[in-house]
Amino acid sequence: AIIEMLVPPNSGPVPHKHTQFQECFYVLEGEVEMQTREGKQTAKQGDLVHIPLDGPVHCFKNNASQNARLLCIVAPSGLDTFFEEVGRKIPAGTVPESVPPTPEQIAFANQTAEKYGQKLYPKDYFDK
């Protein structure tokens, strides 16, 4: 699956791990800070980041003041279906308001992630 991601400033996913697919991020616009236990790396426009099958716990964040746009490529597919199940649809070409998830939304995402071979970790996972 190929997923276009629009990442607003100061946002990104919580640390997570995929056990059933590999993932690549290609930065189309802007930049994101990728993080694993090994450290942080800034991925800029034109950069490609690969997370292998059953790779490390990872996350990314857009620390810039403008949106970042990424292509997320996963094989085999499944992450796209996860996003359809836990996300909300927005009109094409619009930027969703960045609103923190409710405890109920977090619980639903954690439960649903397991069904798709993912494990989500607390946002402070790398601070420990």
Which sequence ranges carry the predicted segments?
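Ligand-binding loop in jelly-roll beta-barrel domains
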Residues: 53-80
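A short glycine-rich, His/Asp/Glu-containing loop-to-beta-strand
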Residues: 1-15, 21
